[in-house]
């Protein structure tokens, strides 16, 4: 049994390194002043995406299609060195009962109704990962979004862009809500080759084996499955790919690189949680 497991893990490692060479290699990111001026990666762009998301129905949808191409590979020059680090010195983090060693507040943007009866209650996650951002970063972004801008792009649609979620029709996107959750930091990881949550920047490859960093074969297997199955513009560098207008960051973080959204984390499955609040995008962003 042990021999079989060893062989399986060896195969997983071999496959991963093959895929790493494919996915973490040669690509040009969309670093422009406006997403409407993105360079089109025609080599990687799936033109079926244009047909699936026509701009007559989905505003700025071509930028989403370009995002899929531009995040297919992760490169060193795409690394952002100001990721949110989960450390005690980070004063922007909200800790439960204001105790640094307690749970911290995160937010997920979801259309799932399973949280609705759990406000104020402790529960355990289902057998799936939950992609989240650290509160109040989403709120800090969407509050300054002006009424003039909202007439062109609705708040829910802009949040989809910010978080690298596909364009959605109004009947679907209007079912989404912001769920704020208390979670222990030990149950969080960053979806990058190095899942450590205390870092300000990500790695494009798995760290070399050392006495300080241990990347398990189980995590490598999870990462490989994401590479093969993920159909969102996943940067693999610890931040969401914002395919919306970069000018929206002008009031919040003018120096932010184009297409860099929010730092993203994942709550591992079977983690104990507590729902703090559930809000519509409009109420959350007041």
Residues of each region from the PLM?
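Bacterial N-terminal signal peptides that target proteins for export
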Residues: 2-12
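Boundary of Sec targeting at the N-terminus
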Residues: 28-33
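C-terminal segment of classical bacterial N-terminal signal peptides
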Residues: 17-27
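ADP-ribose/NAD+-binding catalytic cleft of ART/PARP-like enzymes
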Residues: 34-133
